[in-house]
Amino acid sequence: MTAILERRESESLWGRFCNWITSTENRLYIGWFGVLMIPTLLTATSVFIIAFIAAPPVDIDGIREPVSGSLLYGNNIISGAIIPTSAAIGLHFYPIWEAASVDEWLYNGGPYELIVLHFLLGVACYMGREWELSFRLGMRPWIAVAYSAPVAAATAVFLIYPIGQGSFSDGMPLGISGTFNFMIVFQAEHNILMHPFHMLGVAGVFGGSLFSAMHGSLVTSSLIRETTENESANEGYRFGQEEETYNIVAAHGYFGRLIFQYASFNNSRSLHFFLAAWPVVGIWFTALGISTMAFNLNGFNFNQSVVDSQGRVINTWADIINRANLGMEVMHERNAHNFPLDLAAVEVPSTNG
């Protein structure tokens, strides 16, 4: 009898836990995805802060030339970064217990792999948590779909690209100048500026900014007046009010006359879907582009594509970009190899004798 009561009590305790986890009455929704999200993101954040402040230099290229990234080793907020895991480790799973000592783990850049893998798992769970909360509230799932764009972008630069290149040392450093270095080297090795998927991403980001500014300014300019001249226009809105707070007909008429009639949305729902879809699709394409360039399917190459009747090259902007790419390539990892891959790939002329 006692055993039965104890089992029922433990079941009710588990039931209470399940109800608490999935309750939409909590100030912050946890959810089953949150059970995994919270520890992974806390781990990634904690290790990032500690490593950014105090991690020793890391042998990123695997040639016994460690690179400093932390504040206590001479960096500032701009130059500091979590240095990627050493090329000597490659794509191996490198937890602390795989190293002979903590010093060796730090020297080989173990914190980078720990942070990145926990972070990617955490943001994926955050996306799942968005879907889970939407489901509990009877909402449509598009919030999680929109968040999939930055999740895809982060996965591309932190996981897919290192897999394609064969080493976590090729992943994006976790810092400001490290991000810029990653971008410059990526351009040098993959000509990303000439990749159509990157172009779509640029159109998505800049276009999304433009459309957001246009929408916000149109709405703000066509508010229905509810206040006097001496009050803020924002005081004319009450949270949860049923009536429209701005005149969509006026906004539609203004923009239709500014550009042309069919450039202006007359349906608020389709307008807001467009505002969400444009940048999301653009960033999806950029993430896909990074993932293809990870396996060296690079941007377009129009170098020396224009010649005169004598066969002499007439330089175009593509050739100027190529010259810049070569310059960037010979300067990065300058002690790791004698020649950049593009220059070393030329066949040696055969000799007679």
From Swiss-Prot:
Q: Which residues bind [CaMn4O5] cluster?
A: 170, 189, 332-333, 342, 344
Positions carrying Phosphothreonine are 2
Keyword presence, Cytoplasm? no
Which residues lie in the propeptide?
Answer: 345-353
Q: What's the main place this protein lives?
A: plastid
Q: Which residues bind Fe cation?
A: 215, 272
Q: Where are the bilayer-spanning segments?
A: 29-46, 118-133, 142-156, 197-218, 274-288
Q: Which domain of life is it from?
A: Eukaryota
Residues binding chlorophyll a PD1, per UniProt: 198
Which residues make up the annotated site Stabilizes free radical intermediate?
Answer: 190
Which keywords are on file for this protein?
A: Acetylation, Calcium, Chlorophyll, Chloroplast, Chromophore, Electron transport, Herbicide resistance, Iron, Magnesium, Manganese, Membrane, Metal-binding, Oxidoreductase, Phosphoprotein, Photosynthesis, Photosystem II, Plastid, Thylakoid, Transmembrane, Transmembrane helix, Transport
Binding, a quinone:
215, 264-265
Record-marked site positions (Cleavage):
344-345
Could you tell me one molecular function GO term of this UniProt entry?
chlorophyll binding
Reaction(s) catalysed by this chain's protein: 2 a plastoquinone + 4 hnu + 2 H2O = 2 a plastoquinol + O2
The cofactor note from the UniProt entry for this protein is:
The D1/D2 heterodimer binds P680, chlorophylls that are the primary electron donor of PSII, and subsequent electron acceptors. It shares a non-heme iron and each subunit binds pheophytin, quinone, additional chlorophylls, carotenoids and lipids. D1 provides most of the ligands for the Mn4-Ca-O5 cluster of the oxygen-evolving complex (OEC). There is also a Cl(-1) ion associated with D1 and D2, which is required for oxygen evolution. The PSII complex binds additional chlorophylls, carotenoids and specific lipids.
Q: List cellular component terms (GO).
A: chloroplast thylakoid membrane; photosystem II
Q: Binding residues for pheophytin a, per the UniProt record?
A: 126
The UniProt function text for this chain reads: Photosystem II (PSII) is a light-driven water:plastoquinone oxidoreductase that uses light energy to abstract electrons from H(2)O, generating O(2) and a proton gradient subsequently used for ATP formation. It consists of a core antenna complex that captures photons, and an electron transfer chain that converts photonic excitation into a charge separation. The D1/D2 (PsbA/PsbD) reaction center heterodimer binds P680, the primary electron donor of PSII as well as several subsequent electron acceptors.
Similarity comment text for this entry = Belongs to the reaction center PufL/M/PsbA/D family.
Misc. remarks from the entry: 2 of the reaction center chlorophylls (ChlD1 and ChlD2) are entirely coordinated by water. Herbicides such as atrazine, BNT, diuron or ioxynil bind in the Q(B) binding site and block subsequent electron transfer.
- Quaternary structure, from the entry: PSII is composed of 1 copy each of membrane proteins PsbA, PsbB, PsbC, PsbD, PsbE, PsbF, PsbH, PsbI, PsbJ, PsbK, PsbL, PsbM, PsbT, PsbX, PsbY, PsbZ, Psb30/Ycf12, at least 3 peripheral proteins of the oxygen-evolving complex and a large number of cofactors. It forms dimeric complexes.
Under which name does UniProt file this protein? Photosystem II protein D1
Query: What species is given as this protein's source?
Result: Populus trichocarpa
